[in-house]
Swiss-Prot record:
GO terms for cellular component: extracellular region; membrane; other organism cell membrane. It comes from Ranoidea aurea (Green and golden bell frog). This is Aurein-2.3. Amphipathic alpha-helical antimicrobial peptide with weak to moderate activity against Gram-positive bacteria, and no activity against Gram-negative bacteria. Probably acts by disturbing membrane functions with its amphipathic structure. Strongly inhibits the formation of NO by neuronal nitric oxide synthase (nNOS) at micromolar concentrations. Acts by a non-competitive mechanism, probably by binding to calcium/calmodulin and as a consequence blocking calmodulin attachment to nNOS. Keywords: Amidation, Amphibian defense peptide, Antibiotic, Antimicrobial, Cleavage on pair of basic residues, Immunity, Innate immunity, Membrane, Secreted, Signal, Target cell membrane, Target membrane. The lineage of its organism: Eukaryota, Metazoa, Chordata, Craniata, Vertebrata.
């Protein structure tokens, strides 16, 4: 009976250790994903700003062409 108790405790202990390790890895992966999302959000903002600048220039150029045609 004592042998079964020791075996059972050993199995439970090893199960808890592996569960603890898995939880720790999940937390680390979650933090990494949060950091990646923040970096992607910043890159997306920079891309939007760059695109907005290009659109502004194109609209300005089209507007100036329209003004030139009105003058002629």
């Amino acid at each position: 009976m004592a042998f079964l108790k020791k075996s059972l405790f050993l199995v439970l202990f090893l199960g808890l250790v592996s569960l603890s390790i898995c939880e720790k890895e999940k937390r680390q992966n979650g933090e990494d994903e949060d950091e990646n999302e923040a970096a992607n959000h910043e890159e997306g903002s920079e891309e939007k700003r760059g695109l907005f600048d290009i659109v502004k220039k194109v609209v300005g150029a089209i507007g100036s062409l329209g003004k030139r045609n009105d003058v002629e």
